[in-house]
Amino acid sequence: MKILGKWLLASLLICSMPAKAALDIVITEGVDAARPIAVVPFVWQGTGPMPSQISDVVMSDLARSGTFSPSDELSLPQRNISTLAQFDAKAWMAQPAEAVVMGSIKPYGADKYLVSFQLIDLVKAQLQSGAGPQAANDLVIDSRETVISAAQFRQYGHRISDVVYEKLTGIRGAFLTRIAYVVVKHGEKSPYQLMISDYDGYNEQMLLRSPEPLMSPSWSPDGQQLAYVSFENRKAEVFVQNIYTQARKKVTSFNGINGAPVFSPDGKKLALTLSKDGQPDIYVVDIATSALKRVTNHYSIDTEPSWFPDGKSLLLTSERGGRPQLYRVFLDSGKISRLTFEGEWNLGGSIAPDGRSIVFVNRTNGKFNIARMDLETRFMQVLTSTRLDESPSLAPNGTMVIYGTTYQGKQVLAAVSMDGRFKARLPVGQGEVKSPSWSPFL
């Protein structure tokens, strides 16, 4: 969204980033608060060069999570180990880490590789360092092996990261997820590109290219489709597109605003903003039948819907109180209630996967920051300290928020943990990237 005075358009025009920015992530805050972990480079048991180093993917994932801080490789007391039998607990006594990830990679046929890894409880190892070999197996938190192709190395690295994250935190990892966004390359004949990539920027794929704006991609709950706004026909229209078959369907094409589409939890409907009957209001449309239900009917602006997990109510931004604030409306009864009161504006809300909290843009004293609010206690916490933050998108495990901000006069993509301790920024490259949307678990 463009913040100063144009908050309705803001719901459709979200943040900027370089297409590969996640590869160059700059952690700006929170390293000291992260939990130390050791990732030993996986041992190559073949001849010739290894296809790629899976442990590099694991280290990067854990660092980007904001929860863990991987040790520098040169500080590790053992570096050429891959099994518990090679693990020397006494050598690790002074290592400031709570767990060790180690593994091996060896050829297993034509373009096949056997990848093994173990997650070792270093705290327990340090406590039991004098207990002898009989206690060694107690140190293994998880141990797995699988056969993969060279093309699957990055994907399996993310899988290992998911296992490590969940075993140590009890929260499902979100490293095997993707991000959708719109790339804008000014000066080109068709500057607008609808893109998807892995959450870290790799495996980028173009879904659509257009000379006219593309906006507001939103993932279906099964991760197979995107809803988005296109101006390719010189007017705002909402489409749904399958990311695998490329098949797409025009869902709405009314006069005026067709914007901010978001899938229902069952994937059968879209909540969106339409102005076909006058002022912008919230509607729900059945994707298969095109049946339309009006949810709000007010002379003020209602926009930016977001579904609660049970599918029975929506979060929305409304000016009905005089300024943009967040409201909740129940679909059956039409009952609507205001949720936010602190600050001058609160808008662009998203709901945490557990339905217990929301993240949104809060304006206080002219500064736009990302904030979160507990829906039971109504306690609000401002998560960021910059001035022009916008468009938060939650990871499917609810631990991180991606948002847009301004850095050195340019829009960039940034991330913040849900407790506000960890912050990262993605430096600007060529072109702009707008409307980031984090996928569900895939």
Swiss-Prot record:
UniProt cross-references to InterPro entries, sorted A to Z: 6-blade_b-propeller_TolB-like (IPR011042), PD40 (IPR011659), Tol-Pal_TolB (IPR014167), TolB_N (IPR007195)
Signal sequence bounds: 1-21
GO terms (BP aspect): cell division; protein import
Keyword RNA-binding: no
Assigned GO CC terms: periplasmic space
Key words, A-Z: Cell cycle, Cell division, Periplasm, Signal
Entry's localization field: Periplasm
Domain of life: Bacteria
SUPFAM superfamilies with a match to the protein in the record: TolB, N-terminal domain (SSF52964), Tricorn protease N-terminal domain (SSF69304)
UniProt family annotation: Belongs to the TolB family.
Function: Part of the Tol-Pal system, which plays a role in outer membrane invagination during cell division and is important for maintaining outer membrane integrity.
Oligomeric form and interacting partners: The Tol-Pal system is composed of five core proteins: the inner membrane proteins TolA, TolQ and TolR, the periplasmic protein TolB and the outer membrane protein Pal. They form a network linking the inner and outer membranes and the peptidoglycan layer.
Protein name: Tol-Pal system protein TolB
Species per Swiss-Prot/TrEMBL record: Shewanella piezotolerans (strain WP3 / JCM 13877)
